[in-house]
Amino acid sequence: MSLQISILTPERPFWNGQADEIILPTETGEMGVLKNHAPIITGLNVGAMLIRGGQASGSKDEWNSYAIMGGFALVKQNQVTILANEAVSAENINPEEAKDAFETAKANLEKAEGVKEKVEANFAYKRAKARYQVVKVLKKI
């Protein structure tokens, strides 16, 4: 295995193990991390995080998906430490509920008026979209 990955949330350590690759939803777009990646600290956006191989899955080529609700990532010496506001595995998300929540959040965003309502609707939309994306990766819906 190439990377030691630790994902921590305020409630508990979420996941700790080895993997071959991780794709993070950073503030500037998706960032892939492989063995011997340059050291970096980056902000994480609300979005889908993917982990390939190792203890994350039964197969070297299998991807596992997680919804991350923002945070930070530190990459250094083949260790990836993620401090996330919240994290949830695709396996723990109901696909139908995720789809319904996404469609509702999208509709609410489109009809939002006023700055506060738009900001709240945008965050709810990003959150619902992340959950729906990771379920689609896992369930292929």
From Swiss-Prot:
Transmembrane segments: none annotated. GO terms for cellular component: chloroplast thylakoid membrane; proton-transporting ATP synthase complex. Keywords: ATP synthesis, CF(1), Chloroplast, Hydrogen ion transport, Ion transport, Membrane, Plastid, Thylakoid, Transport. CDD domains: F1-ATPase_delta. It is found in: Plastid, Chloroplast thylakoid membrane. GO terms for molecular function: ATP binding; proton-transporting ATP synthase activity, rotational mechanism. It comes from the Eukaryota. HAMAP family: ATP_synth_epsil_bac. F-type ATPases have 2 components, F(1) - the catalytic core - and F(0) - the membrane proton channel. F(1) has five subunits: alpha(3), beta(3), gamma(1), delta(1), epsilon(1). F(0) has four main subunits: a(1), b(1), b'(1) and c(10-14). The alpha and beta chains form an alternating ring which encloses part of the gamma chain. F(1) is attached to F(0) by a central stalk formed by the gamma and epsilon chains, while a peripheral stalk is formed by the delta, b and b' chains. In plastids the F-type ATPase is also known as CF(1)CF(0). This is ATP synthase epsilon chain, chloroplastic. It comes from Chlamydomonas reinhardtii. The lineage of its organism: Eukaryota, Viridiplantae, Chlorophyta, core chlorophytes, Chlorophyceae.
